[in-house]
Amino acid sequence: MADALIPVEDLSEEQAGQELIRLAAAIAHHDALYHGKDQPEISDADYDALKRRNDAIEARFPTLVRSDSPSQRVGAAPAGIFSQITHARPMLSLDNTFSDEDVADFVASVYRFLGVMPDNSIAFTAEPKIDGLSMSIRYEHRKLKTAATRGDGTTGENVTANILTIKEIPTELPADAPDVVEVRGEVYMAKSDFLALNAQMEAEGRQTYVNPRNTAAGSLRQLDAKVTASRKLKFFAYAWGEMSTMPAETQSGMVEAFKRWGFPVNPLTRRLTSVEEIIAHYREIGLQRADLDYDIDGVVYKVDRLDLQARLGFRSRSPRWATAHKFPAEQAFTTVEAIDIQVGRTGALTPVARLEPITVGGVVVTNATLHNADYIEGIGNGGERIRPEGHDIRIGDTVIVQRAGDVIPQVLDVVLEKRPETSVKYEFPKTCPVCGSHAVREKNEKTGKLDSVTRCTGGFVCSAQAKEHIKHFVSRNAFDIEGLGTKQVDFFFESEDPALMIRTAPDIFTLKQRQEASSLTRLENIDGFGRVSVRKLFDAIDARREIALNRFIFALGIRHVGETTAKLLARSYGSYAAFADAMQEAAPKFGEAWNELNSIDGIGEVVAASMVEFFKEPRNLEVVSRLLKEVTPLDAEAVTASDSPVAGKTVVFTGSLERFTRDEAKARAESLGAKVAGSVSKKTDYLVAGPGAGSKLDKAREVGVTVMTEDEWLALIGW
């Protein structure tokens, strides 16, 4: 791992969005190598770390989840070796929890969303999280029809012939089973069978396999079903897709139905009614983990009643009614050989510990994040001491390294007894190591305290920031220019040739013109390019001369403005001209424009201030002005279409709702394309008022907003 990453808890929304783009590309690459070619180039643990970082970021920023998120697809898109099957119901992923407190928060969120008091106990099921390959098996008229891998969550590979070789999976269901049944579960290889297979491979002088999960996945994708049959794969059923009729009203009842129909179900599954019982069962499974003949990496909790699952519904990527409680991270000891500083797109200076190579959880670790200057000193973001004796981290120290949800491990603590006598305190740089500009810690306007992050003040003068900004600009959820990847951006940015250099985003759109005017430096003659690839690059650039407003705003790289915030802004202002005018009018940070900006649901004072500061900076205005000469941002209405009667409308809920909780009403409105705001303004389209409505109702009447009852709202949305 050449570069350290900012820890999840220190990411801004903007940084998180960019990191999710990087992770999606990396995981898709490794999925394609493994699932498409059966040629993995990283270990199982390293792959898991990528997935865990992605999940950790999405758990902290759930609104940033994109359509190509690994949590939506878990695996590669079908590679073409097998035919494809579209799942009748998508195979989604679960959110992860890592502590008892996280589990308690999950349970509390269920009660809170449903509007149920804790003394009305809700039952949960708890089952081991099998470390295998997810599978959906479809039966029609009780005969096994098809079997598909999870694939990208929407489309999987047809592995029916290979599934038929797994003796534990019935080919025919009993007479009481519905006409259409999709049973979902996990295909896995027992540890004992894995060890026996590797012993056989070693005896034959062949390369052994890495772990049971990867072996099971590769075995299931064999073109010769006889090979699959020889691998002795097994199956646990725990979920379902399409069902013509439901055989039970609870999760536990469904599992019992699977058992009656002849499917193996996990014997450690329990039905529990309190956080204490859930945690106790987690501990019990953890104690048995080493003795089980199959790999598990946690325990999955689900709300038992299916009607409550339906009410809780889904976030954009995962159910609200389930979570996966992962087992603890692994730790190891090593030595800090050096501390380097990396500069990010927003100027953040992130210290990175260069470590003596050590294996943690099956992965060789050479780098670990040190978060920020305070962390090196043993101080947390709130000013508290984060190590037992408040000691600092120094070059030469023996440290405890942990791998958890992050790709890059963290240095947890220092072994003071092994500290060299010659060690000296690390001095955090006061200037940027890239451009030499002052490095400062900004004061938080709300708390009055210094931010934990030290930032370079160089802006676009700093080559590290400028280059990273271009990478952000061309990224998937911004301008998404095919052919301008990391290597290509590095090449163009570092070039000193006027016909090739790209130092700011507008330079991308003048590249073709500069190439046509040059008689000397032809891009097609440079190693790594060529006539066809150059033509495709220019076509890709020209295809982005018109772009959706939300993508344009996101691409500007405004600090704290991530993909979701950009969508909110595009929906609220409609056109770039209106958006830019509003930012200028809001610059004094008071008045109607400022208040309107702050009233947009999901945008607070910190984000609003960052936006108006961006548009006050002359250098930014100059770059945007040049960009607008090359690119046309399309009005939001021109790129947003929906049959929903409330799509694009702004809705405010006030008073008591009788049919739904406030969270349920908000989730339903947003799923139909509406924007739910927290306060009434001239931009509000509907105010849904229940009993006890107060000042918001008065304000709505004052500014002429349409007011409706809960029943009228439900009639409007067709509920």
Swiss-Prot record:
PROSITE patterns: BRCT (PS50172), DNA_LIGASE_N1 (PS01055), DNA_LIGASE_N2 (PS01056). The active site is at K129. GO terms for molecular function: DNA binding; DNA ligase (NAD+) activity; metal ion binding. One of its GO terms (biological process) is DNA repair. It catalyses: NAD(+) + (deoxyribonucleotide)n-3'-hydroxyl + 5'-phospho-(deoxyribonucleotide)m = (deoxyribonucleotide)n+m + AMP + beta-nicotinamide D-nucleotide. The keyword Transferase does not apply. It holds the Pfam family DNA_ligase_OB. NAD(+) binds at D44, A45, D46, Y47, D48, S93, L94, E127, R150, E186, K302, K326. Belongs to the NAD-dependent DNA ligase family. LigA subfamily. This is DNA ligase. The lineage of its organism: Bacteria, Pseudomonadati, Pseudomonadota, Alphaproteobacteria, Hyphomicrobiales.
